[in-house]
Structure formats: C-alpha cells, structure tokens
UniProtKB/Swiss-Prot annotation:
The keyword Membrane applies. The keyword Transmembrane helix applies. This is ER membrane protein complex subunit 5. Belongs to the membrane magnesium transporter (TC 1.A.67) family. It is found in: Endoplasmic reticulum membrane; Golgi apparatus membrane; Early endosome membrane. It comes from the Eukaryota. Component of the ER membrane protein complex (EMC). PANTHER family: ER MEMBRANE PROTEIN COMPLEX SUBUNIT 5, PTHR21181. Its main location: endoplasmic reticulum. Residues 23-43 are lumenal. It is a multi-pass membrane protein. Part of the endoplasmic reticulum membrane protein complex (EMC) that enables the energy-independent insertion into endoplasmic reticulum membranes of newly synthesized membrane proteins. Preferentially accommodates proteins with transmembrane domains that are weakly hydrophobic or contain destabilizing features such as charged and aromatic residues. Involved in the cotranslational insertion of multi-pass membrane proteins in which stop-transfer membrane-anchor sequences become ER membrane spanning helices.
Length: 131
C-alpha cells in the first residue's frame, strides 16, 4: 500500500486519540459538576481510546519499514575477520611513544631545537608587546 495511506491512518489515529482525551476531560468536568466523582469513564470513551491507539500503532509499524533480524549472523556475513574487531575511531597517532622510544642522539638535538624555537618565539612576543 502507499505510504500516504499509512500516514493518513496515523493521522486519523492521533486525531481519534485527541478526541478521546477531550471526551475524557469533558466527562470528568461533568462529573465534578454533578458531584459524582467516583464513577469511571463510559465504555465508549475507553473503547475509542483503545481502538485509536491500536490504529496509530498499526500505521506507525507500517511507516517504519522492514525490521532487521535480531540474529547478528545476517550482519556478520558481509564482514571479514579482519574488519570484525577493527575500530579506526580508536586509533591514536599523537601519543608519547614517539618521544619515549626515539634514539637518544635525536632526542637531544630535538630538545635543543625546541628550546631555541621557544626562545625565538618568546622574543617575538615581547617585541610585539613593546610596540
């Protein structure tokens, strides 16, 4: 069936639910006026509420489309073993291992380079503040 039919069915169901809520509110206010607050809702309002709820749920289920299988084997058929436990979003390339595990002669020279670049940067900042 056409998707617009199911959307119309959901609309009708929601309208009927709103009407049932309005009817229940009117019945409650009528019961307060007549001082008969211990009576329950009439059966027609209860049936309208249940039927409208069922129609709305039926329409929503058809709008949602096909459900997926709960069994994971259908999803796992398309994946290889290598990609099964592969989570590239957890890869971190900017970590301290690069500094900890490099040879000591390059570490000393890079520290000196970093110190000289830091001092030149500080000097540039001081010059910009003096102006």
């Amino acid at each position: 069936m056409a998707p617009s039919l199911w959307k119309g069915l959901v609309g009708i169901g929601l309208f009927a639910l709103a009407h049932a809520a309005l009817s229940a509110a009117q019945h409650r206010s009528y019961m307060r006026l007549t001082e008969k607050e211990d009576e329950s809702l009439p059966i027609d309002i209860v049936l309208q509420t249940l039927l409208a709820f069922a129609v709305t749920c039926y329409g929503i289920v058809h709008i949602a489309g096909e459900f997926k299988d709960m069994d994971a084997t259908s999803e796992l058929k398309n994946k290889t073993f290598d990609t099964l436990r592969n989570h590239p979003s957890f890869y971190v390339f900017n970590h301290r291992g690069r500094v900890l595990f490099r040879p000591s002669d390059t570490a000393n020279s890079s520290n000196q380079d970093a110190l000289s670049s830091n001092t030149s940067l500080k000097l540039r900042k001081l010059e910009s503040l003096r102006r």
